[in-house]
Amino acid sequence: WGEWHIKSEDGLVPMPDEAIRDEYAADYLAAFPTAKLLMRRPFNIAAKHQLGLYNDMNGEEKDTMEWLGWIAEGGWYGDEPHALSAMPTFWQDAPVGGEFTSSLSMRDMLGKKLPRTLRLLEASHMSFIGPKTASVKYAKGYNAVLKQLGYRLRVTELKLTPCADGVCAELTVANEGAAPFYWEWPVNLYVEDAAGST
């Protein structure tokens, strides 16, 4: 993901306009043509190129709901009334990333407010979260968060039928996660005998 932080309160120039922002994004798109890139907000270029989005305020309800609002409706960014595009179904084609907010403690997010944290993650269709991690004393909550992330593939049915070369296998796989599997990857099935040989 890429985050742009401009500390204008420290005297730095404000965020450049859309044309300049798009030049930066175009450089990344050219440099990483097969990668799934993410942006902090649903800028128009993110919608145009089906980029993923990134929420750095996970666990904070007000900020996450604002972020989800940008995704649902698009709208203003700074002085630009049409800088953000509505991208309500982007997560079906590109990943959602994020990190836990620094404004709340892990004790809150992974303890007493865990149901809220999980609800916000589910609404976001989050694929990954990092880099901030919880201490081992919050393992139960952290594991619940991990179960809420990304894709969760499982085999729901296996059919074995005789065929000319031995046995043919047909697998049915379900995704029970909050996000799809974004790449077409081949599936390999290995069969072992009792001795562990394939």
Which residues fall in each region the model found?
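Catalytic-core regions of glycoside hydrolase
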Residues: W1-A134
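Surface beta-strand/loop "capping" patches
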Residues: A144-A194
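A beta-strand/beta-hairpin structural motif
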Residues: S197-T198
